[in-house]
Amino acid sequence: MEEIDLCWRIQNSKFKIRFNHNSEVFHANAASLKQTNPKKTYLNFRNQLFMVTKNSKNNLFFLLIEKFIIDAIVSIYLLFDKGFNHFIAIIKAYVSFYKHINLLIEFRKKNKRHLKHYQTRSIIFKYLFHKR
């Protein structure tokens, strides 16, 4: 997720993202925390909220409402699939987000978002309702 945030901030600063197809990337996915660790769930949800708030050009209010609804559905799923600790981790992520929201809004105001956003649609709804 950090690499997405970095690319988003680079583009918002009017730089361009390039790639080299000859490069080789070694990525230790979840090297520090295992997928079963609720702390990983907490960090993933919190960092998503921070990233969207800092970088999105869209109307933040409606975007966060949509994200909250999706996250609420996911949290209920995780409650039954992975247990109570993952459910609580998502609640803690939102508490942390609301504690930091003033700083995130300040960051938004200071840093202009210059991206020409394309129309985005939820891949979750696309998967659930269109089976793609």
Question: What is the meaning of each model-derived region?
Answer:
Residues I91-R132:
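Membrane-interface aromatic/basic loop that binds lipid-linked glycans or pyrophosphate carriers
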Residues M1-D5, K40:
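Acidic donor-binding loop at a coil-to-helix junction in glycosyltransferase catalytic cores
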